[in-house]
Amino acid sequence: MTVKYIGKTRNMELTNGKCYEVLSVERGWYRVKTDMLGDYLYPAHLFEIVEE
């Protein structure tokens, strides 16, 4: 699944408006590969789905 980050740009972790690939969904949270730090879990409300 591809999602677009709709939150604030966060210290080079995630960039507002950028699309990210969801590696897995865990208890409603998305595991995405960040811009700099590897992959982490983030709450789904911070993203909008671009492609399922």
Identify the role of each PLM range.
Residues T2-L46:
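Basic/aromatic-rich interaction segments and small domains that mediate binding to polyanionic partners
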